[in-house]
């Protein structure tokens, strides 16, 4: 709040300063030659790569005492570090570098644009525009000028990386939009505006990640590790598919046995049957869905947006059924709560089933449409599927992480209340005299099964949410670090088509790449619940249900009439 007040005060001062400044950048041709260098005394401009300035400056201020209050108005922008170059840019305007040249050296247009791109969006939030007196078109492009300061950039990058890891705000928002020219030629896309890469320095539009695995400078994992991830996912998806199918068949064989409050497990199993099918299709399809050719070169890039119909279909199915599983988990906890705390019967809970279905299928459908409209679909090069938020931290947090956490939290509250009620019922039964041990034993078994299933669902789902948050916060740093190493390697500059100098390469945030165990746990946590559902239905009653179903089918088989047998014997 205090920061916002400071920024509002800054912008009010800026408006007044624009009216007071009558000397433009272009009027410096009449710059006086009777001048001398003086030591910088303006606090904001101390400890830069230069310590001597000259006046009048580029805005017409004749002394440092006059320029000091004017540049001090920008202190809030410096403090929030909206741009890595804002401090250097302002100082080269208000306290220009003193040299042996006749005129003071102006800041380069690139330096101005870097400062403007970082801070203009913040100014617009408060209803102000970038000051006309600092119009970047007034500054030179190729003449002698002050460019980016590498040490300043490094310090600012380190600050931004630390801020992102701590709070996850700048990483997830990524409001700064970089120039598309920063994207290497072989990663540049021509298929639409929905392609972009989230970097620590901002969002890089019209750009996508290469799909090819590389062992020299891998994007997180090399080819060998990617194969391990693909095999790992295939094994767990097959196991999840088999167990989910077994659960579905078990329910359908004797549906009356699984009334509410346990009926939602049927729909949970159906959701994970669909999720496992998506992963198996991704394994079989290799990179046909997650990757494609979207630029002017034959380089395969990660699919983003809804252009690839197959990719979009996989992503929607994966997202829809994952959100439905979260909703059915919440309904399962609610049904247990109604049965244990409010003493509702199975018929009373079943009467609410139309509302349960409307919520569990309707809300995910709305979210799935939103995902498509916002182009939040992209490919996962490690599994071959398409899903939400692999290269989009905002989508991963808003569409995946948040619903999972909300459903887990609400479900946990309902579950704890239900279990507490069962504990009270157990204490009450102990006071009875008829068949006490038998009743207590049945209740304890039910409590044990409910608690075990809740743990086997909650732990993997919570782990999945934690890994998603970890991925969303660190993905911009991983991408920027990978792009930095590609940019500075001479053999990669030509291979990828970097068109700007090495000095302009992205800074290395020095964030360690994730361990393979993180992504192994990510994929298993999305599939293991399907196996958990099968554990719930495994019992002696299940064997009895299958035996009865077999006998029922056998009794329907056609029998040979007796007189036909007699004829054949003759």
UniProtKB/Swiss-Prot annotation:
GO terms under biological process: canonical Wnt signaling pathway; embryo development ending in birth or egg hatching; embryonic digestive tract morphogenesis; embryonic morphogenesis; endodermal cell fate specification; engulfment of apoptotic cell; establishment of mitotic spindle orientation; gastrulation
Phenotypic consequence of gene deletion: Embryonic lethal with severely defective embryonic morphogenesis. Embryos have defective mitotic spindle orientation in the 8-cell stage ABar blastomere. Furthermore, there is disrupted asymmetric distribution of the transcription factor pop-1 and the disheveled homolog dsh-2, which are required for cell fate decisions in 8-cell stage ABar blastomeres and their descendants. There is also abnormal distal tip cell migration along the anterior-posterior axis of the body and defective clearance of apoptotic cell corpses in embryos.
Matches recorded under InterPro entries: Frizzled-4/Mom-5_7TM, Frizzled/SFRP, Frizzled/Smoothened_7TM, Frizzled_dom, Frizzled_dom_sf, GPCR_2-like_7TM
PROSITE patterns: FZ, G_PROTEIN_RECEP_F2_4
Residue intervals on the Cytoplasmic side: 252-264, 341-348, 417-449, 537-570
Residues annotated as domain FZ: 32-148
Signal peptide: 1-16
Free-text note on domains in this protein's UniProt record: The FZ domain is involved in binding with Wnt ligands.
Protein name: Protein mom-5
Organism in which the protein naturally occurs: Caenorhabditis elegans
